[in-house]
Amino acid sequence: ASFNPGKVILLGHSFGGRVIIKLMNRAGLPFAVDKIILVDSAGIRPKRSLKYKLKVLSYKAAKAALGFAPVRLLFPDALENYRKRMGSADYAAASPIMRQTLVKVVNEDLTALLSSIKAPALLVWGVNDTATPLADGKLMEKLIPDAGLVQIADAGHYSFLEQPFIFNRVMKSFLQMEEGV
């Protein structure tokens, strides 16, 4: 029995975009992907500033100090409170094993996979996105062979929530392309 889902269009926001990039590079998918839409997508490892590197170094030092047995006995919640203050909301809410996974995933650079994406790709980016900067979208547009980038003004990482009317118009236009509608 063959699997035929019909027309397949994948849409992913942030981490979902990362999943699509990996999926599009997987050999032997049981279906063809007609189009992809990456919205404020993750996947490009950011260039780390000196400020960021110092923050990581200070976090590791604090983690070592707060994890020291006598300190842990005196201040049992100090390390967890520090983690919650320093990390993202996702990181703070995650279990210890999931935290390790998050760190590995966030640091994985998928740039080399972009040029292998064969499906037409729409990239939608909030101009003010700080989680996955617009520069990432511009790089993806250059590297994905059949990609176009739409920049949404007055929007950040959740461009589809911050500018829903514009976002929906862009979606409708892309989805109707080549259908003669």
PLM regions with names:
Residues 155-169:
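Catalytic histidine-centered segment of alpha/beta-hydrolase-like enzymes
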Residues 1-8:
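Conserved acidic catalytic loop of the alpha/beta-hydrolase fold
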Residues 130-136:
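Conserved alpha/beta-hydrolase "acid-adjacent" motif
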Residues 8, 12-17, 126:
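Conserved alpha/beta-hydrolase "nucleophile elbow" surrounding the catalytic nucleophile
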Residues 38, 49, 64-119:
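Conserved alpha/beta-hydrolase catalytic His-Asp/Glu region
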Residues 116-117, 123-125, 129:
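Short beta-strand/loop motif that positions the catalytic acidic residue
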Residues 141-158:
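Catalytic histidine neighborhood in serine/cysteine hydrolases
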Residues 18-26, 31-68:
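Flexible "cap/lid" loop of the alpha/beta hydrolase fold
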